[in-house]
Swiss-Prot record:
Subunit field text: F-type ATPases have 2 components, CF(1) - the catalytic core - and CF(0) - the membrane proton channel. CF(1) has five subunits: alpha(3), beta(3), gamma(1), delta(1), epsilon(1). CF(0) has three main subunits: a(1), b(2) and c(9-12). The alpha and beta chains form an alternating ring which encloses part of the gamma chain. CF(1) is attached to CF(0) by a central stalk formed by the gamma and epsilon chains, while a peripheral stalk is formed by the delta and b chains.
Name of the featured protein: ATP synthase subunit alpha
Signal peptide: none
Keyword set includes Transport: yes
Record EC number: 7.1.2.2
Gene Ontology cellular component terms for the protein in this record: plasma membrane; proton-transporting ATP synthase complex
PANTHER family membership: ATP SYNTHASE SUBUNIT ALPHA, MITOCHONDRIAL (PTHR48082:SF2)
GO molecular function terms attached to this record: ADP binding; ATP binding; proton-transporting ATP synthase activity, rotational mechanism
HAMAP family on file: ATP_synth_alpha_bact
Reaction catalyzed: ATP + H2O + 4 H(+)(in) = ADP + phosphate + 5 H(+)(out)
Keywords annotated in UniProt: ATP synthesis, ATP-binding, Cell membrane, CF(1), Hydrogen ion transport, Ion transport, Membrane, Nucleotide-binding, Translocase, Transport
């Protein structure tokens, strides 16, 4: 009997010794009111700003307004599932999304959940979407080109890795087309891409995803979608989700391109959210912190120095203007935050100039620092020549008596504008662009009529990609980043030959109607008037 008592006593002592009382503490509040996707909650006294809270029926919300009596919560789920008196508890966490290689070639919503029907995302790493931007001492100057594949941009408005370049213009002027062409052009260049669709039609996003799949560009791209049918809170967090996915790649020393399409709708979503939360409205009913909304987002784009991995995020925010008014509130805000803008103009678009980039209004504050030596050597005064052309064009409308110099400027400018026309989804490498522009710089295209300039461009690309000599020169330019004197001379001869070949194939070509080749290219025997 005594032995049994001793055994029982030992068991009790052992259990007391190993007893671990776990207290499950959770701060729980009650829903006071609900409406328009906003819940007013009481009892969450210690909730933090931007913390995720969980309602009954597993509906999630974001704590945005922290007041003395109540907390304003923006809902991510169906507000019809919540009613007054329902309980709500803190999660103790801010919004986190999956990041890493598993996100590539996937289409996700603003919470990082897959919506492409390809099954769950197998990512072991999560990252918070609200972070501070990299500090000053972690950054490096922008001096490497990010090739868009668009002649008008790469030659006159160069974009560098780590830059924030705004694409701004009226609706239906080709802003998204520029962004998608840039994504397609990153194929084989070891640049990851994140496309964030904010407030876009689902049919439009589906077309974009299909095109990226067709071109093989989805292999290195993640698409984040907060469509027009999504709630304001989901549209509000979408760009932060996109840049968080990009930051993971940047931290690994990789280069990333992020496109926000578009931040006008993002600002409207934030305005809607703020007004529903009864925050005081400011100019155009936007809240007072709408500038910070975009600056904190765009400052997360950077090029890091080697100590921090040497990766970069290049941001292409898109802004839609009304009737070309770039002096409105949101456009001026984003212009002041970014490192330049690509301005698309409706009149250019309607006249057939595609992409409809207004070279005069567009600017890159990084400039030629983001260009290869090959491109720098041939661009020269191209932008100035087009500015002179536009100025002369305005004067030419008032009179027909023009001197020879003015006629030459007008003819040359018209040919350059024809040269920078480019079909969508057909990017051109910077090496090929540089060679094409030699013909402009050296005035070799003088003898080619404006209507045949596109043929000149096509023949140059064909020469560089098919001709044995051309392939060697193209390879040298890509590898070395410069055009040697020897190669430059060879290219001049090849371009003269191409232009003469085009001219000889034009029926009823009259050489007297066009300027001749510069003297250094003229043979002792005059060029035949074919």
């Amino acid at each position: 009997m005594k032995n049994n008592f001793d055994d029982i006593s030992a068991i009790i002592k052992d259990r007391i010794k190993n007893f671990d009382q776990k207290i499950d503490r959770s701060e729980v509040g009650k829903v006071i009111s609900i409406g328009d996707g906003i819940a007013l909650v009481s009892g969450l006294d210690k909730v933090e700003n931007s913390e995720v809270v969980i309602f009954d029926n597993d509906v999630y919300g974001l704590a945005l307004n922290l007041e003395e009596e109540a907390v304003g919560v923006a809902l991510f789920g169906n507000s019809n599932l919540i009613s007054e008196g329902d309980s709500v508890r803190r999660s103790g966490q801010v919004i986190s999304v999956p990041v890493g290689e598993a996100m590539l070639s996937r289409v996700v919503d603003s919470l990082g959940k897959p919506i492409d029907g390809k099954g769950p995302i197998k990512s072991s790493k999560m990252a918070k979407i609200f972070k501070l931007a990299p500090g000053v001492m972690t950054r490096k100057e922008v001096n490497q080109p990010l090739e868009t594949g668009i002649i008008a941009i790469d030659s006159m408005i160069p974009v560098g890795k780590g830059q924030r370049e705004l694409i701004i213009g009226d609706r239906q002027t080709g802003k998204t087309a520029i962004a998608i062409d840039t994504i397609i052009n990153q194929k084989g260049k070891n640049v990851y891409c994140v496309y964030v669709a904010i407030g876009q039609k689902n049919s439009t996003v589906a077309q974009i995803v299909q095109k990226l799949n067709d071109t093989g560009s989805m292999d290195y791209t993640t698409v984040v979608v907060a469509g027009a049918s999504e709630s304001a809170p989901q549209q509000y967090i979408a760009p932060y989700t996109g840049v968080t996915i990009a930051e993971e790649f940047m931290s690994q020393g990789k280069d990333v391109l992020v496109i926000y399409d578009d931040l006008s709708k993002h600002a409207i979503a934030y305005r809607t959210l703020s007004l529903l939360l009864r925050r005081p409205p400011g100019r155009e009913a936007y809240p007072g912190d709408v500038f910070y909304l975009h600056s904190q987002l765009l400052e997360r784009a950077a090029r890091l120095n080697k100590k921090y991995g040497g990766g970069s995020i290049t941001a292409f925010p898109i802004i839609e203007t009304q009737q070309g008014d770039i002096s409105a509130y949101i456009p001026t805000n984003v212009i002041s935050i970014t490192d330049g803008q690509i301005f698309t103009k409706e009149s250019l678009f309607n006249s057939g100039q595609r992409p409809a980039v207004d070279v005069g209004f567009s600017v890159s504050r990084v400039g030629s620092a983001a260009q290869t030596k090959a491109m720098k050597s041939v661009v020269g005064s191209l932008k100035l020549e087009l500015a002179q052309y536009n100025e002369m064009l305005a004067f030419a409308q008032f009179g027909s008596d023009l001197d020879e110099n003015t006629k030459a400027i007008l003819e040359h400018g018209a040919k350059v504008y024809e040269l920078i026309k480019q079909d969508q989804y057909s990017p051109i490498s910077q090496a090929d662009q540089a060679v094409i522009l030699i013909g402009v710089k050296e005035r070799i295209i003088n003898i080619v009529p404006k209507e045949w300039i596109s043929e000149y461009r096509n023949q140059v690309i064909k020469y560089l990609q098919k001709d044995p000599d051309g392939k060697v020169i193209e390879s040298n330019i890509i590898n070395e980043g410069i055009i040697s004197k020897e190669n430059y001379a060879k290219l001049e001869q090849a371009l003269v030959k191409i232009c003469k070949s085009i001219v000889s194939s034009i029926p009823n070509y009259d050489a007297s109607m066009h300027k001749s080749l510069p003297e250094k290219y003229l043979e002792t025997k005059e060029v035949d008037n074919v």
